[in-house]
Amino acid sequence: MTSAPTLASPLLDRPGAVPGDGPDAGVARHYGDPLREQRALVRGAGWVDRSTRGVIAVPGPDRLSWLHSITSQHLSGLADGTGTEGLVLSPHGHVEQHFVVAELAGTTWLDTEPGTAPALLAYLDSMRFLLRVEPRDVTAELAVLTVAGPDAAAVLTAAGLPAPPSLWAVVPIDGGGFARRTREHEVDLLVPRASLTGVADRLSAAGATPVPRPSHCTPGSPKSARSISGAPK
């Protein structure tokens, strides 16, 4: 599967930011002190710039039953304010797409690996038939920022952002977007792209350290839950 170009993050302008390359182009490789940054995920809290992930919005009354029928996940009964993960499989059972899901206020949101949203949208469009669904790529509108570490909930609260109370809970954010808890000490924030720098500044002021994406962790150093589990970037 080929990947489309990704949007460069405005957080690359932060002091000490070293741009990534290859599949991680568009976000920082680190912010000047990789080992200290990685330790924040174990001892405190860090925010991870994952704004190169693709985001697709799927409104329409048939969205959940439709997604249930064309992906690997049981989505037909997904409740409002909850999330999960899903796959698109080839006819031979090979994984072609992985995405993380949030169901909120009449729209199902799918975020996926950097550069792969156009391919996922093309697949969804090819399977629409006459159903009442309107998938669209909103990567240019929403950006993903993940807060992780044992102090993640405290940092989110101090920053004036929601800390979802349970695993896979999804909570709206004032000003747009939502927060989704994916692990015990890990929350994804999907925020308006124009607000990304401001949200990162609020998290930093509340005590979170900017940290590199999991693929940049040094061997033998602390790693985030995503890199340990092999979950997506």
Language-model features, listed with the residues they occupy:
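Basic, glycine/lysine-rich polyanion-binding surfaces/domains
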Residues: M1-K233
